[in-house]
């Protein structure tokens, strides 16, 4: 994918995140700083900075005590399946972090649609892997209760 297309798709994904109830109702948001080929998070950070009721936290290797106050987590990943499973970069950082969160915390993965395996494929998870509540791509929102496809 060329850089221009990646930027366009990243913007679409982020605008979709900003339009969700989960984003609108979240006060404390943990969000990754995008690098390389990951979906950009610049629009999300900017949107949160415009709203005084939102506080942004960035992931750290040793999460602070405020982890219990997080309403929403935006996570990256390498590949996902439609059953809400996620493979990251293999270090287990996010799974350890997500496991500490209260059950009420919403976990949203943002990804390009090509990163999501079709329903015929399923990622093999281990006991430590944490499933997402929602996966948002440029084409659809995948939720535990079903998929919303965008009209092209």
What residue ranges belong to the model's regions?
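N-terminal active-site beta-alpha-beta segment that forms phosphate/nucleotide-binding
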Residues: 1-69
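Internal, well-ordered alpha-helical segments in soluble enzyme and binding-protein domains
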Residues: 9, 13, 93-94, 131
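Short, basic, glycine/proline-bearing loop/turn elements
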Residues: 29-30, 78-83
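Redox-cofactor binding/interface segments in oxidoreductases and associated redox assembly factors
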Residues: 31, 75-76, 137
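Flexible loop residues that form catalytic
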Residues: 34, 78, 140
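Short, solvent-exposed loop/turn segments at secondary-structure junctions
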Residues: 36-37, 79-80, 115
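Charged helix-capping and loop-helix junction motifs
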Residues: 46, 89-95
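Surface-exposed, charge/polar-rich loops and edge strands
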Residues: 64, 68-72, 82-83, 96-152
């Amino acid at each position: 994918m060329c850089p221009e297309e990646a930027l366009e798709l990243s913007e679409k994904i982020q605008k979709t995140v900003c339009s969700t109830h989960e984003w609108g109702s979240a006060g404390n948001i943990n969000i990754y700083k995008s690098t390389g080929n990951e979906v950009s998070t610049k629009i999300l950070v900017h949107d949160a900075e415009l709203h005084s009721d939102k506080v942004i936290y960035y992931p750290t290797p040793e999460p602070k005590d405020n982890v219990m106050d997080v309403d929403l987590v935006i996570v990256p990943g390498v590949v996902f399946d439609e059953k809400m499973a996620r493979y990251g970069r293999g270090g287990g950082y996010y799974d350890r972090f997500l496991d500490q969160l209260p059950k009420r915390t919403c976990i949203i993965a943002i990804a390009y649609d090509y990163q999501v395996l079709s329903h015929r494929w399923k990622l093999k998870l281990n006991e430590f892997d944490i499933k997402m509540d929602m996966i948002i791509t440029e084409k659809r929102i995948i939720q535990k209760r079903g998929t919303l496809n965008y009209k092209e």
